[in-house]
Curated annotation (Swiss-Prot):
The active site is at residues 172, 295. It comes from Bacillus subtilis (strain 168). Homohexamer; trimer of dimers. This is Intracellular exo-alpha-L-arabinofuranosidase 2. Pfam families: Alpha-L-AF_C. It catalyses: Hydrolysis of terminal non-reducing alpha-L-arabinofuranoside residues in alpha-L-arabinosides.
């Protein structure tokens, strides 16, 4: 008998995996927007109306469902009117003390979303803004015609209003968004959200600024005071192997201890979702309010020689395992977790893409998103996994995790992670209810070294490969996983 056992009920769905779990986040931070996404129409780098063509095409492959902007901490010092029409510069006080040109504003962001065919998720300014400013931004974007803001939008080149589905009322108002107490922010949220009105057939999904990590009191206060006025409540949690203030650890030069600690801290998101979810259930037993994990991912020390305020870090196979582990946990909580936005899309923190001048590379995290996109809006299949332990220095974690989903046409996708940096894993999976698969295939992302990563000189060092180390006999699936690996198995429906 294999050391790892699992049962997948191929005909029992536990819920739907909201595609928005695979959302993204792009902040005016470092080279995340400028140089990363936006190069301007005068750039020698190929672009579409100022947006980098290579980055755009790569992001399209991910089927990004939703993109959060302009922050982050930047959102609570962003004054949207400076980014339309005649642009006004400002100081980005949060991230590197740089001058923000506001060249990339509302029109450019909405154009990006249209090109990506994704929903915009805009975060409004509560920390330093006003109710009127937020109200006028909504009017500018979504009112058809005949008002000062809608007429200004038309003067600036956009005739038709945009569709705006998601709007966040402030960001991290417990910290960079104003250092508020939850009671104070709850009252502000109630006030500000009143003026996030629905125009032109819009039905805006309002997201309240939620807790940092394990601040369960914040969640309790917000749900008690404002649950009926919100559609979603956010949660922020970063995977940091070290200490946030004293040293987070290197993205590439790390020890075996740090590998294990990183995996352990990644798994902590499961406990956080359960505990915040239990509080939300107290005030929202029908689970109408979504838990929106709109900032998550690894956070390491910046790369040496870069501006520390730019949060530029490399991305290894370790990051890939962190991403895959998060997705498996998000899937299991798909009733409550309705959106998640990794930080961030390009050149910042756990990025999909890194750029350097004209050059671009895809990170191991990008490849996980690309492999896992098959789970978007699919039915989560009931799965029970009996994993052997991944042991390190007297501590243990489950060595493997498995998630399975079924698409509308009947194809079944199974993703498996082996987080052990040293040991392979052999798993035996019973596929109950499976009669026959017309075809099957496998893809694997792995590496020989735990700090393996892509560079501009070797951009394909870590990439997905065809995977054949498995057998399927009737309804028995046997899989051999190397250390540090993420596998996707697809069983195509017999038509």
């Amino acid at each position: 008998m294999s050391e790892h056992q699992a049962v997948i009920q191929t005909d029992i769905a536990k819920g739907t995996i909201n595609k928005n779990i695979y959302g993204h986040f792009a902040e005016h931070l470092g080279r995340g927007i400028y140089e990363g996404i936006w190069v301007g129409t005068d750039s020698d780098i190929p672009n579409i109306n100022g947006i980098r063509k290579d980055v755009l095409e790569a992001l399209k492959q991910l089927h990004i469902p939703v993109l959060r902007w302009p922050g982050g901490c930047f959102a609570d010092e962003y004054h949207w009117a400076n980014g339309v029409g005649d642009r006004k510069t400002m100081l980005n006080t949060h991230w590197g003390g740089t001058i923000e040109s506001n060249e990339f504003g509302t029109h450019e962001f909405m154009m990006l979303c249209e090109l990506l065919e994704c929903e915009p998720y805009i975060c409004g300014n509560v920390g330093s803004g006003t109710v009127q400013e937020m109200s006028e931004w909504i009017e500018y974007m979504t009112f058809e015609e005949g008002t000062p803001m809608s007429d200004w939008r038309k003067q600036n080149g956009r005739e038709e209003p945009w569709k705006l589905k998601y709007f966040g009322v402030g960001n991290e108002n417990w910290g960079c968004g104003g250092n508020m107490h939850p009671e104070y922010y709850a009252d502000l949220y109630r006030r500000f959200q009143t003026y996030v009105r629905n125009y032109s057939g819009n039905d805006i999904y309002k997201i309240a600024g939620g807790a940092n990590v394990d601040d369960f009191n914040w969640t309790d206060v917000l749900m008690k005071k404002a649950a009926g006025l919100m559609d979603g409540l956010s949660l922020h949690y970063y995977t940091i192997p070290g200490d946030f203030w004293k040293g987070k650890g290197s993205a590439t030069e790390f020890t075996e201890d740090e590998w294990f600690i990183t995996m352990k801290k990644a798994k902590y998101i499961d406990e956080l979702i359960q505990k915040h979810g239990t509080i939300m259930d107290r005030y929202d037993p029908e689970q109408r309010v979504g838990l929106i994990i709109d900032e998550w991912g690894t956070w390491f020390d910046p790369e040496p020689g870069t501006n520390p305020g730019f949060l530029y870090q490399q991305n290894t196979i370790r990051d890939a395992l962190v991403a895959a582990s998060h997705f498996h946990i998000f899937h299991q909580h798909c009733r409550r977790v309705q959106m998640a936005n990794i930080a961030q899309t390009v050149n910042v923190l756990q990025a999909m893409i890194l750029t350097e001048g004209e050059r671009m590379l895809l990170t191991p995290t990008y490849h996980v998103f690309n492999m896992f996109k098959v789970h978007q809006d699919a039915s989560l299949l009931a799965t029970e996994t009996m994993s052997a332990d991944y042991e390190w220095n007297g501590e243990t974690l489950p060595q493997i995790s498995i998630s399975a989903s079924k698409q509308a046409e009947g194809d079944i996708n199974i993703t498996i992670c082996n987080i052990d940096h040293q040991n392979k894993a052999e798993a035996e999976i019973e596929l109950r209810g499976l009669h026959k698969a017309a075809d099957h295939s496998g893809v694997i992302l792995t590496a020989e070294k735990m700090n393996a990563h892509n560079t501009f000189d070797d951009p394909h060092h870590v990439k997905p490969e065809s995977f054949r180390q498995y057998t399927l006999s009737k309804n028995k699936l046997k899989v051999k996983l190397p250390p540090m690996s993420v596998v996707l198995l697809t069983l195509r429906a017999d038509s």
